[in-house]
Amino acid sequence: MAKAGVLTTSDYLPIEAFERLLEGLHRDKKYVWELFCSIAFATALRVSDVRSTRWMDVLGKDDFFKKEKKTKKTRHISLDTTVRDRISELYVIMGSPDKNQPVICNKKTEASFTTQYINRTLKKFRVKYQLPIKAFSTHTFRKTFGRYIYDSAQDKTEALVLLNRIFNHTSIETTMVYIGLRQDDMDKAYRSIKFKSYDEAISV
């Protein structure tokens, strides 16, 4: 677990690559991992909070409350219809487990997978599905959520403020680095500002 104020070294996944990952996991019948990736992305929860989430918390729910292990704060999380449907479909495919079970767990022991085991498995998926990412870990999905929200927003400033609140970061700058807005992204933004030449202005 990262210390407070210290950013993790994981990267975000471009949304197209994330969707390809889900398709691959479903095709290969790795349903528990499809579920993990889906919930981790859709809720932007840390892995410790995903691991403690039970079926009864999310199955058929429009929203739910989750007390974060790290911050001790309670988050209210809304789920889109498509997210609810995905969870319900996977619940049936996985044999309709006991609703008191963690959504991510070992079938035999009914114990949640450890974070270390999840990270080891994700590294295998990075290779298997040829994902364009160097540092792939449990934190990737939280960052992918952030980058997706930012890229989809018309007002980038509002998106950063919103993400800053969701992630509970100390500054907007921290949020920018967290979702992968590095110097080259900022350079590109500045260079998008162009003036007409005097000749062009006169001809108009």
Predicted regions and their residues:
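Active-site-proximal segment of tyrosine recombinases
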Residues: 49-51, 146, 154-168
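Short basic/aromatic active-site micro-motif
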Residues: 32, 133-152
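Catalytic-site neighborhood detector that most strongly recognizes the C-terminal catalytic loop/helix
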Residues: 68-72, 167-192
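Active-site/catalytic core of tyrosine-dependent DNA strand-transfer enzymes
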Residues: 18, 82-133
